[in-house]
């Protein structure tokens, strides 16, 4: 791999720390000296400094860029802050670097927006920018799920990256998921699909609560184990080597219900992805990777751990928050009620049609929300 001398990271929310394995891949034992992270405020500053090996400072991005002359700038602030950071910090630094003959850093931007083309429009055609949407799967119960979920990588049309720097960008992505290189528009509906599938967490909450109300000691992990096994049954296989499911941890009577809901949720999301123009083979590939990885997460984690993970990933106003908001408003109550009715012998097969339609509708809503976010740039 091409040598990386220095990395500057703008933003220290969850993603800034989550990328630590990537910094280590690029820099090895030089992370402490050659990764510089800049926060917007001093909130939790000392806590973060104690937790991470790299230097963390506040509000001095331009100064750090001038000092470090990085090979890579990682952009992971809230999307709304990006235009100001580009105007007040990146534009002057890139202009100074050009005038001094200093090589321009590659820009790795994280989040659904902006399109990498926005950076080219603001900074000039001689830059190199790539957008990352990592799978965000985590290590749960000692099982490393990171590389099994779908990660999306977006280069600009024409892809001006030199081959060695392009490969470095891909290698960085591969650490955090199974990489799919797709255009910006496709990345928005791929991300919407993943975040709709993320509501598998909330499905497990609703079914677990319904069973608990009926006197069954059934955790979200038990529900996840059954859904994972049932998913693999109707898909004809899966990554059993990564995480095993089980049909024996829930009351046998709930299995037909879980089978119907799991299959409906998978199909509703897939139908939406294909409806907006995605080639079905590609859609099945990345959707299946995310769906199974999320079911593995539900199977391996406690409810508290799932809720903590969601709190870390659900950016205020973002696509994950939107998926959960719509699910909770429109389907959580009906799903709990249907699970109870099924156990009492009263569920209609039509409920699964409703579930499939709801998955489609949530995906559509989240996709449109992603476009509204993109429209701000």
Protein language model features and the residues they cover:
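Internal alpha-helical scaffold of NAD(P)-dependent oxidoreductase catalytic cores
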Residues: 51, 118-127, 145-301
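NAD(P)+-binding Rossmann beta1-loop-alpha1 motif at the extreme N-terminus of oxidoreductases
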Residues: 1-72, 175, 209-215, 274-275
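NAD(P)-dependent Rossmann-like dehydrogenase/reductase catalytic/cofactor-binding core
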Residues: 1-5, 33, 224-253, 260-377
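Non-catalytic structural scaffold of enzyme domains
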Residues: 7, 15-21, 44-47, 60, ...
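Glycine-rich beta-alpha junction loops
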Residues: 41, 112-114, 133-138, 186-188, ...
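Rossmann-like NAD(P)(H) cofactor-binding subdomain of soluble oxidoreductases
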Residues: 19, 52, 57-169
């Amino acid at each position: 791999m091409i040598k990386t001398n220095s990395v500057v990271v703008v933003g220290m929310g969850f993603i800034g720390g989550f990328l630590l394995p990537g910094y280590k891949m690029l820099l090895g034992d030089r992370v402490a000296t050659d990764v510089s992270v800049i926060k917007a405020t001093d909130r939790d500053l000392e806590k973060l400094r104690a937790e991470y090996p790299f230097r963390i400072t506040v509000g001095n991005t331009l100064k750090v860029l001038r000092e470090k002359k990085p090979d890579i700038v990682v952009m992971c602030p809230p999307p709304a802050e990006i235009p100001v950071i580009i105007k007040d910090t990146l534009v002057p630094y890139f202009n100074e670097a050009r005038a001094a003959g200093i090589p321009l850093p590659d820009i790795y931007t994280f989040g659904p927006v902006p399109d990498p083309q926005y950076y080219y429009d603001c900074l000039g055609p001689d830059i190199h920018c790539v957008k990352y949407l990592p799978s965000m799967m985590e290590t749960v119960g000692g099982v490393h799920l990171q590389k099994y979920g779908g990660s999306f990588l977006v280069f600009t049309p024409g892809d001006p990256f030199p081959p060695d720097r392009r490969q470095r960008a891909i290698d960085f992505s591969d650490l955090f998921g199974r990489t799919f290189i797709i255009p910006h528009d496709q990345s928005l509906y791929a991300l919407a699909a993943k975040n709709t599938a993320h509501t598998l967490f909330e499905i497990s909450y609703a079914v677990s609560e319904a069973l608990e109300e009926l006197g069954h000691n059934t955790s979200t992990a038990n529900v996840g184990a059954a859904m994972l096994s049932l998913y693999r049954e109707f898909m004809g296989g899966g990554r059993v080597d990564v995480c095993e499911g089980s049909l024996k941890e829930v009351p046998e009577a709930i299995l037909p219900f879980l089978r119907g809901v799991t299959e409906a949720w998978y199909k509703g999301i897939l139908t939406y992805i294909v409806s907006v123009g995605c080639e079905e083979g590609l859609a099945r590939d990345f959707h299946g990777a995310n769906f199974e990885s999320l079911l593995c997460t539900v199977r391996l984690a406690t409810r508290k751990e799932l809720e903590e993970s969601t709190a870390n990933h659900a950016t205020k106003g973002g696509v994950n928050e939107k998926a959960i908001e719509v699910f909770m408003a429109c389907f959580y109550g009906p799903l709990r009620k249907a699970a109870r009715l099924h156990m009492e012998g009263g569920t209609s097969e039509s409920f699964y049609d409703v579930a499939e339609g709801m998955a489609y509708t949530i995906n559509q809503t989240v996709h449109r929300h992603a476009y509204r976010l993109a429209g701000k740039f």
